[in-house]
Amino acid sequence: MGSYLNPGSMLFRGSLRSKIYIDKSGLIEKINELVCTEQKYVCVSRPRRFGKSMAANMLAAYYKKDEDTKPLFDKLLISQAKSYEEHLNQYDVIRINMQQFLSETHNMEEMLSKLRNYLIMDLQEAYEKIRFREKTSLVQTMKDVFAYTGCPFIILIDEWDCLFREYQKDKEAQKKYLDFLRAWLKDQDYVGLAYMTGILPIKKYGSHSAL
């Protein structure tokens, strides 16, 4: 378990213990249909306080492979689905909140550098037996892990659009950010699912699309 790789399930457990909890686990069945398909890129655009983060926490708890979370889901709607046990606790999960990284740094370059370094640290600590080809490359590190495990990643990104909201006029920063997302996620066989949440709808920014 790392801070960003296969994080603990405490946030979802907290939701389950809440006095008011609405079972949204039916979403998992829909997402299971997309894992490792050409439709594996999902973006959920909703206003704040719409339960986007809770849903991402639920997906992280369901897919993460280093913890038995079956007791959390056995009484929920997803337990009735045919795909329930097929995907339960079967994947390496990367769970990040882009707003946290942006808030803790001073510019886009620093944000991306910190993100890369933290993810690489989690991955290389979890798979210390692997001989990594490029220890400073996030993409190559994930390729090396995938080649070793044969298990694709479930990547959950909260507040993916925060940079566009805070750097509305900085087109160069927006371009570099989209270039990073594209290089990291698009056409990579280590991606089993890329699930992103935000406020703004995905659209084309200048000559660049988000993915």
State where each predicted segment sits.
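Phosphate-binding site recognition
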Residues: 1-211
